[in-house]
């Protein structure tokens, strides 16, 4: 016997008053029942808890309601407001009804939440205001329902400390930055953990699989763990309108990567945060824990990064390789500033091993995955293209990283003396 949500009396077409148990409603009957509702009835229909028996035992109708598409029966939509929590890496969300479909964030009303419950405001002044900034189709509810990526402000309109989008938007709206149309391609790595033991998916509990080597981009039950989650996430992002461009299994078993981009300016951060939220929801449903820890397992195992590919209009045009080298020079001079902004716990990952450079030293190279900045062979050959910043950790804030790259390469200028010394140090001719 199970308690389920069932239509009120006028909708119980196959339930008799004399029967001690409700007649089971099949999936076909349930669909027929729903399709017969008019908009008027859909608004007024009440649901109550009832018990249902079946020949096979208990039937749980919650799934039927979860899959119920409300779009044919109402103009109202459900908007899931998403924001970044107090740790700066956690995602929070809550839902509200909006009276009609929307096509732009400006049509979505501001909202608020209890910041004292997320570590973002004191209890005596706990209200934090959500400003809608980007909308995506909701892959979980379907129809006209939406996901709304927001940033957070005090009631006075000041961005709260964890709102990194506000500063990023200022940088991306600078005329010098706008003129260069910065592109970003972000490679988000993540690790899947078994729920109760917090140990990587596919690993023996308390033990280790065979050494790294056979797992990268592999197929097979003994080499690939979590493909269903990766693929579900891929399709959900495409449905949502996120600019996801690919996915692959990573070097460490139980670790995966997806790529978002190329995206222009602030859009890169919006799309990464929306994709992270969707991934959290999918792992929630799958009963698997998601971690963005940059080094989830100590020892001879790869860490998890968020490599960020970056180019400007000048880099993509003829002669762009010289512009790229000048950008690399600027990045070398601001290495410490970037490292401090590139994610928590990154020192455990950037050791100079496992396809990383040392956190303390800046380096660059062509096709060298052991450098801070990698330039592809095609970029060198064509004399134009992009650079890859391999320093960001998997838990980095994409608003911070993308904006800092633009600031360091387009808005910040070193002294001639510092530039000359840096060029000599990293063997870079500009």
Curated annotation (Swiss-Prot):
Catalysed reaction(s) here are: L-glutamate + NH4(+) + ATP = L-glutamine + ADP + phosphate + H(+)
Alphabetically list the UniProt keywords: ATP-binding, Chloroplast, Ligase, Nitrogen fixation, Nucleotide-binding, Plastid, Transit peptide
What broad class describes the main subcellular location of this protein? plastid
The answer to whether UniProt assigns keyword Chloroplast to this entry is: yes
Role, per record: The light-modulated chloroplast enzyme, encoded by a nuclear gene and expressed primarily in leaves, is responsible for the reassimilation of the ammonia generated by photorespiration.
Stated family: Belongs to the glutamine synthetase family.
Put simply, this protein is called: Glutamine synthetase leaf isozyme, chloroplastic
Q: Which organism does this sequence originate in? A: Pisum sativum (Garden pea)
| Recorded name of the encoding gene | GS2
